[in-house]
């Protein structure tokens, strides 16, 4: 029995560990360190219809317990992703989750329609929550009606299940999650980065050229856990949880909160082996906690019927 196997819409995962979009590129660099087939899946970097060069530098700044980034969805564009990046990943035994982004609804629809046809793309991650772009991005993820409409339009053209990435920069994330579920989303991924800023002590000006950036890393884990805990009780579609995950213990916490799988982001920059290390350590942690299968942990913080053996 594979104690870590997880079944989600469109995704048969040998384990629930997925490198998060934006922190793993298209896997090429990490493939030099280990066989990517050990992973549950990969969320590739956000793809837009046309190439994007991102925001001006500086666009990364360290913070206590994390980092700020304002990359701005830099990517080579749909054509290169389809003709080069996705074919490269075909050598690995794992389903790919394609992250879809755009400036307007038509952009999302065009990318989703094309990229969902790729043979190794088993699901889409609809990026309606990037805080670092002037148009699109978070603008689609902070209004329930707009988020639902975009979800519905993408679902109509996608050939694979659609997961929607939620922004934490909202007043009521449950309301938005339910609107997206009602629009036909197959799952949710959460959370994206929190909007933040750093100032230069000598100039008193923002360190990032974009002024603000997305905060990620261990600092946001408590916020992410709280939001997964709230949303998982309000919807009936699976959640891929993310936000500050660095260890096997972090993974179990997200499962307790209600996640069905997890994505590891910023930690990949610190330790390129973090994902395989977590995968290796999870079985022993399940033994220590008294679980036969990782699914027994799902929603344990609020499901009264969940018991360890």
Swiss-Prot record:
Q: Name one GO biological process term.
A: 'de novo' UMP biosynthetic process
Subcellular location per the Swiss-Prot or TrEMBL entry: Cytoplasm
Q: Which PROSITE patterns match?
A: DHODEHASE_1, DHODEHASE_2
The residues that the entry says bind substrate are 45, 69-73, 127, 192-193
One term of GO molecular function = dihydroorotate dehydrogenase (NAD+) activity
The record's comment on protein family reads: Belongs to the dihydroorotate dehydrogenase family. Type 1 subfamily.
Primary role:
Catalyzes the conversion of dihydroorotate to orotate with NAD(+) as electron acceptor.
Which superkingdom heads the taxonomic lineage of this protein's source? Bacteria
Record flagged with keyword Transcription? no
Cofactors named for this entry: FMN
Q: How the protein assembles, per its UniProt entry?
A: Heterotetramer of 2 PyrK and 2 PyrD type B subunits.
Q: In which pathway does it act?
A: Pyrimidine metabolism; UMP biosynthesis via de novo pathway; orotate from (S)-dihydroorotate (NAD(+) route): step 1/1
Q: Does the keyword Oxidoreductase apply?
A: yes
Q: What's the record's note on cofactor binding? A: Binds 1 FMN per subunit.
- What's this protein's name? Dihydroorotate dehydrogenase B (NAD(+)), catalytic subunit
* Cited InterPro entries: Aldolase_TIM (IPR013785), DHO_dehydrogenase (IPR050074), DHOD_1B (IPR033888), Dihydroorotate_DH_1 (IPR024920), Dihydroorotate_DH_1_2 (IPR012135), Dihydroorotate_DH_cat (IPR005720), Dihydroorotate_DH_CS (IPR001295), Dihydroorotate_DH_I (IPR049622)
Q: Write down any Gene Ontology CC term.
A: cytoplasm
**What is the protein's species of origin?**
Bacillus mycoides (strain KBAB4) (Bacillus weihenstephanensis)
- Tell me its EC number(s), please: 1.3.1.14
